Regions:
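Amphipathic alpha-helical "stem/stalk" segments
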Residues: 31-138
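Membrane-embedded hydrophobic alpha-helical segments
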Residues: 1-29
Length: 138
């Protein structure tokens, strides 16, 4: 038996196995990053909803808008965080029509709520629709 041939074959087999493990790891890594992006969006929506629940139902009076000016700014910052998380998903959620439509509704309603022409309940409904959908592990 030629030991050089034997060790060459063993090395080739080990290299092939290592290549398969590397490809598998890269695939899993990509899936893990997708999961993190979806989770970040859902958590951002949860934070946004949490603040909405602490605010008045409607900012229909100037005194309310003034009293809650810091919270209104924070709500806009949280919407920005939601938008950032949405962008990071890089179209992973576009196949979920319910998510897309409710996210669009949040974007459309946010400014109207802060100006006093819409109620917080609308935003809560849109947030709940997103939060109740199981899309992270799908």
């Amino acid at each position: 038996m030629d030991w050089a041939t034997f060790w060459s074959a063993a090395s080739a087999i080990a290299t092939t196995a290592a290549a398969f493990v590397a490809v598998w790891a890269i695939f899993r890594w990509k899936k893990q990053d997708e999961l993190k992006a979806k989770m970040a969006f859902k958590l951002a929506i949860a934070d946004y909803k949490y603040l909405i629940l602490q605010l008045p139902d409607q900012f229909d009076k100037e005194e309310l808008r003034n009293k809650y000016s810091n919270e209104r700014k924070k709500l806009t910052d949280l919407l920005s965080a939601c938008n950032h998380a949405w962008l990071v998903t890089e179209d992973l959620l576009l196949s979920h029509d319910l998510i897309v439509s409710n996210w669009s509704n949040i974007l459309d309603t946010h400014a109207h709520y802060l100006q006093g022409s819409r109620q917080s309940e609308e935003l809560v409904i849109f947030c709940n629709a997103i939060l109740s959908k199981k899309f992270i592990f799908s």
